From Swiss-Prot:
KW Cell membrane (keyword) present: yes
Record-listed E.C. numbers: 7.4.2.11
Membrane topology per record: Peripheral membrane protein
Taxonomic lineage of the native organism: Bacteria, Pseudomonadati, Pseudomonadota, Gammaproteobacteria, Pseudomonadales
Binding partners and assembly: The complex is composed of two ATP-binding proteins (MetN), two transmembrane proteins (MetI) and a solute-binding protein (MetQ).
Protein name: Methionine import ATP-binding protein MetN 3
Main EC class the enzyme belongs to: translocase
Family annotation (PANTHER family): AMINO ACID IMPORT ATP-BINDING PROTEIN (PTHR43166), METHIONINE IMPORT ATP-BINDING PROTEIN METN (PTHR43166:SF30)
Cellular component, GO, one term: plasma membrane
Reaction(s) the record says it catalyses: L-methionine(out) + ATP + H2O = L-methionine(in) + ADP + phosphate + H(+); D-methionine(out) + ATP + H2O = D-methionine(in) + ADP + phosphate + H(+)
Keyword check for ATP-binding: yes
Origin: domain of life: Bacteria
Chief location category: membrane
Occurrences of domain ABC transporter (ranges): 2-239
Length: 325
């Protein structure tokens, strides 16, 4: 688990804070997306997580250890558990794919035969088993990023930090890289922190998310909680409501339900019990953060406003969230 506590970063006297009292918690095995526009402080925050950037104040706890309190040798050991992938790939063009992935293992002093076995295993994992002897110039952008991911995994990290890793890729390649990251999270149990300016990236694979603006944390939490909170701007951005004409005299609500929650049969049962005639104005199901999320817009006659509210209360007791409009 990573805990960020009241983190501040100021680059110079009189300069605005790049990070201003940011606090958040990244649970173990989460895919945590940090969303924001250019200049929001995303990259600064990510670089602070492994102390490539030293914060001006505040603390970063990783597995309970305060990184800022570690000695140089202790910090080096801690960093061995943190992999990082970059927007620009950062590959050595004079070395083969195999030799690029082997760099962290060479630094760690692993023997040649062990290095080779580990590298070939990783190349199979990222779908480049046939590219070991190729050079970066012979690869596509997506393949280069797969090499970068394999290199980041070489030392067997517990955490993987992704700095806009898909922003230079086309949509199809972006989708394949995100699928690979989701697979790595699922199969290896890594905790992944990724920064992005694209809502679709968060929507595709993130279990948790935070939004930054002007160096400040706007909101954070589990994606499911954000989607179910009518007050969450990030939740509304990830899954916008229905833009329908609104009759102010007619009670309406928007329901949010997840995975195997069966909203339609439950609505039918409860409305029948209350002799309430409901109209379904709109509905749909989408995949968000690896979960199925459904939305329904429902309405009733003005005379049934009391029964309608009772229905929403009964739905809430069964785990289906609603926003009265």
């Amino acid at each position: 688990m990573i805990e960020v506590q009241q983190l501040c970063k100021v680059y110079g006297e009189g300069q605005p804070a790049a990070l201003d009292r940011v606090s958040l918690t990244v649970p173990d095995r989460a895919v945590y997306g940090i969303l924001g526009r250019s200049g929001a402080g995303k990259s600064t925050l990510l670089r602070c997580l492994n102390l490539l950037e030293r914060p001006s104040s505040g603390r970063i706890l990783m597995d309970g250890q305060d990184l800022g309190a570690l000695s140089a040798s202790e910090l080096r050991r801690q960093r061995q558990g943190i992999g990082m992938i970059f927007q620009g790939f950062n590959l050595l063009h004079s070395r083969t794919v195999e030799d690029n992935v082997a760099v962290p293992l060479e630094i760690a002093g692993l023997g040649k035969s062990q290095r080779r076995a580990r590298v070939l295993e990783l190349l199979e994992l990222v779908g480049l088993g046939d590219k070991a002897q190729a050079y970066p110039s012979q690869l596509s952008g997506g393949q280069k990023q797969r090499v970068g991911i394999a290199r980041a995994l070489a030392a067997g990290p517990r955490y993987l930090l992704s700095d806009e890793a898909t922003s230079a890729l086309d949509p199809e390649t972006t989708a394949s890289i995100l699928q690979l990251l989701a697979q790595i999270n699922r199969e290896l149990g890594l905790t992944i922190v990724l920064i992005t300016h694209e809502l679709e990236v968060v929507k595709a694979i993130c279990s948790h998310a935070a939004s930054l603006a002007g160096g400040r944390l706007m909101e954070s939490g589990a994606v499911a909680e954000l989607l179910g909170n009518p007050q969450s701007a990030l939740g509304r951005a990830l899954l916008p409501g229905y833009n329908l004409p609104f009759n102010g005299s007619q009670p309406q609500a928007e329901l949010t339900f997840f995975d195997n929650q069966r909203a339609a049969p439950l609505l039918e049962q409860l409305s029948r019990q209350q002799a309430l005639e409901l109209k379904v104005l709109a509905g749909g199901v989408e995949a968000v953060g690896g979960r199925r999320v459904g939305r329904l817009r429902i309405a009733a006659a003005p005379a049934d406003a009391g029964k309608f509210q009772q229905l929403l209360t009964a739905l809430a007791q069964r785990g289906i969230r609603s926003e009265r409009l």
